[in-house]
Structures are given as C-alpha cells and as structure tokens.
Amino acid sequence: MEEGAKIGREHEQQQQQHGRVNGSGRVAAVGGGSGGGGDEIEIEVAAAAGASPSRQHGGLHGDVQAPTWKRFLAHVGPGFVISIAYLDPSNLQTDLVAGSSHRYSLLWVLLFGFIFVLTVQSLAANLGIITGRHLAELCMGEYPKYVKYCLWLLAELGVIAATIPGVLGTALAYNMLLHIPFWAGVLACGACTFLILGLQGYGARKMEFTISVLMLVMATCFFMELGKVNPPAGGVIEGLFIPRPKGDYSTSDAVAMFGSLVVPHNLFLHSSLVLTRKMPYTSKGRKDASTFFLLENALALFIALLVNVAIVSISGTICANNLSFADTSTCSSLTLNSTYVLLKNILGKSSSTVYGVALLVSGQSCMVATSYAGQYIMQGFSGMRKCIIYLVAPCFTLLPSLIICSIGGTLRVHRIINIAAIVLSFVLPFALIPLIKFSSSCTNIGPYKNATSIIRIAWILSLVIIGINIYFFCTSFVAWLVHSDLPRVVNAIISSLVFPFMAAYIAALIYLAFRKVNLSDPFPTNSVSGEIEVQHIQIQEKQEDLGVHL
C-alpha cells in the first residue's frame, strides 16, 4: 500500500506539473508512467459530446480503431450548420435576381465561389482542431485591449446583420402561408428560435441534426420546384462551367454574388463546432479529424451549391418564357415577396405553397445558426460561463433584429436585406484576416501550419473580396451622394465624416494584415468553452492509474 501511495503521489505531481486544459475543454496530460512514453493524450470533456468522463476517456483509443465510416459519421454535423448561411433569404433573393436577369450565365460564379468558401471554412475548422480554441478565443488572447473589443463589437454587429434576413424571410413566409400580420410573424420567428436553441441542453449533435433536417427540407422544396420548371440541362451545365457574362450589369451582379458568399459569423462558428467532437491528442488524430471535417463540409456545401443552382435555374427558366405584361414586370424586379405571386400565377398555388415552406425553413434555420454563432462569439470574447451565454447571447442578437424588422415591415424587406448585406461585407475582413493570420502562423500552430499554396490562395481571394466590398461601398455612397436631394451643406458634412471613416477602416485592415502573431502557445491553459468537470476527470485518472499499479 505504501508503494501504491508513493506511485499515486508521483503521478499527482506529474499531473500538476504537466496537466493543463486546452481551449476546447480537453485535459491534456503528458504521460510519464510505464505506458506513457512522453506521448500526449487528450481527454474530451466538452459538454456537447454528451458522454460521461469515463466513456470519453475510454474512447480515446477505441475510436481510432473504429471503422472509417463510423469515424466519419461522428464528424458529420458542423458543415451542415455552416452551409445554412448560403441558403438564407439574402442568398435566395440574390439567386432569384441573378436568374431573372441573366438566366444561367452566372452559375459559374456560384461554383467558383463555393470552392473558395470550402477553402476558407477548412482553415477555420483546422484552426479549432489544432489549437483547441475557436477564433473568438484566439482573438481575445492575441490582440490588445481596445483592438479585441472592437473586433468583438464588429463580430456581434455581423451576427445581427446576418440574423435580419432570416427574420424577414420567416415573417414573410408566415404571411404567405398563414396570412398572419408581418409583426406577428416576426414574434413567432423569435419564439421558435428560442425553442430550437433550447436543444443545446441535450447536446450539440441534437442542434446540428435539427438544422440538417431543415436544410434537407429546403433542398427538397426547391428540387420539387425545379422538376416542375424543367430547365434545359445544356444551358445549366454551360452556365455552371463556362464563364460567359451576358446582359446589362452582368459583371457587377457576378461580383456582388461572389462577394456575398463568405459571411463572418461562419468563421467563428466553424472553428467552434469542431471542438464538440472527441479527437485523440496526436498528430494522426488531428490529421484524421481535419480530413473528416473537410469531406463533411464539402458534402454539405455541395448540397448547398445544388440548391443555389436550382434557385437560379427556376427564376431563369420562368422569366425567359412568354409571360404576361404583369409577370414580365415582376421578373424585372424580383423579390422574395413577388416570387410567391409569380409562381402562383405561372405554376399554380401548390408551387407557391412549396416556395413559402422553403422560405420559412430558410429563414428559421438561418436565425438558429446565426444565434448559435453569436453564443460562441460572446463566450470567446467575454469569457462568461455557458449557462449565462445561453440566456444573454440570443437576446443580444435576436432583439435588435426583431425590432428592426418590425419597424421596417413588408414594404422595406428588399432594402433592409441589402443594407444587412452591406454591413456583412463591411465586417467580413475583421474575421477573415485574423483567421488567415492565425492559420499561417508558425508560432501559433507550429508544424500543423497549412500549406503555403492554400494560404496564398486564401490571401489572394480574400483581398479580392475585400477590394470588391470596399469598391461597392464607395461607389454606392458616391452614387447616393450625387443623386441625393439633401442640401449641399448636409452632403458636405456627411462626406467629411464618411471618407475619414473609410480611411480609418482601411488603416485598421492594414494593421491586422501586417501585425505579427504573438500568441505562441498552441495548447491554451484556460478556456471558458471547456470548463466541464476538469478537476473531476483529473482525480478519476489518478484513481484509475493508482488502481492499475496496485
């Protein structure tokens, strides 16, 4: 017994010397016993995994030996939650306009855009896998006080802007299907979102499963519509693989479509969701996890791409036919609301009902996903406990969106969605640049740094998107200023405020791009997102190890 107690004390000293908690709530310990050999192992303690500590400990080695398809299925979920952002009412409206104005000639923009999205999202997923922290936590630990709080404010602003189209789309769908007032639809949308977010108490997988089902329902609805319209397969395939912009404003519309594909909250969300999975704390374990998450994300994005192609093809086929004067006028300025009327006039009431269901699912799933991202963003930047975040974050993101949409009403839906898109494009660089900086930092992720070619492609395409967004913002503002009916004095005052603001905006981006990453510990010592029974598991490990030696 004395020998056993001595071994136990030695093991406890090793735990105190080497044990630490990484950013995803995992206990990392350097084994120094007979079977340790200096290998690092990771014990999953994330609450969302839904397993007891003893089961999680036992699964470290058993999961690696499981069949490949089982390990892949264990990683399915985050990609589908991420893909919802590319099926929200804002993208739906953009696709409808692109199809009605240019038929199938801009489909290639979607294809290349989704390839870029897959690249960027894989960087976000790998960042979480390698560092054990999500993007918000890394920003909080890396940047000076005022910089990180500005990043937090901008990230929350992006979540609110991404939530607004979801609220509008859901409220419109309720009005189409149930003929209830717009404001009542807004309230119903908020209530349903709170209810679905309550599934977090049963684990992250339940939330991911719910959002995945909503995504598949939406895909089914639009594929049903596509079957009724029956677009020419040759024209769709040609538009998908051969860049041939046709018609007025085709170039600007293509640029706008590409620039709106990457959304900032997805970068925070993806780096967070990967931390809800059990992963062995080894080089092979990380490599396998990265591969599985990449394949899962590619599958989900492929489904999202098909749905977007279907939406463009539906509006492109309908508006290319011989229509009445009223329907032709509707096609010239297609919106979420007018599409319902157009489908009802041409394909019948059943078709418009299917569209209404798809819009409802699109808006509601968008609301849930963005609110979910807001929770991780607030947790990472504030350090508050999850139980508080679950209550505060949805109110912080949902209430402003609900108020804005209630005031705007149905007549301003198109304008509000456009303003929300501008805000998202404004916020995007402040999430995208830190992500690429962390992903390419040798001090932050060391030997697991992404390939140089991937980083270069990400930088080039990111600079293109940032340049597009800045260009459109400046040109839109100048056009508004030229055609404004305001007095010259007021225009001069507005200009004196906006242009210095844009100069400060560009200076902030340059600061983020050229600032050296100083965060050198790839396995953090403290992370609120994983404060789940860490001490209990450490004690349990000591007891189990002591029992083995005895």
UniProtKB/Swiss-Prot annotation:
Major site of localization recorded for this protein: membrane
Biased composition (Basic and acidic residues): 1-13
Segments traversing the membrane: 72-92, 105-125, 151-171, 177-197, 207-227, 255-275, 292-312, 354-374, 388-408, 416-436, 457-477, 492-512
GO molecular function list: cadmium ion transmembrane transporter activity; manganese ion transmembrane transporter activity
Keywords assigned by UniProt, alphabetized: Ion transport, Iron, Iron transport, Membrane, Transmembrane, Transmembrane helix, Transport
Topology versus the membrane: Multi-pass membrane protein
Residue segments, region Disordered: 1-37
Gene Ontology terms: cellular component: plasma membrane
One GO-annotated biological process of the protein: manganese ion transport
UniProt feature, compositional bias: Low complexity: 14-29
Top-rank taxon: Eukaryota
Localization in the cell: Membrane
InterPro entries: NRAMP_fam
Job description of the protein: Probable metal transporter.
Family: Belongs to the NRAMP (TC 2.A.55) family.
PANTHER family documented for this protein: METAL TRANSPORTER NRAMP4, SOLUTE CARRIER PROTEIN FAMILY 11 MEMBER
Matching NCBIfam families: nramp, Nramp_1
UniProt protein name: Metal transporter Nramp4
Organism field: Oryza sativa subsp. japonica
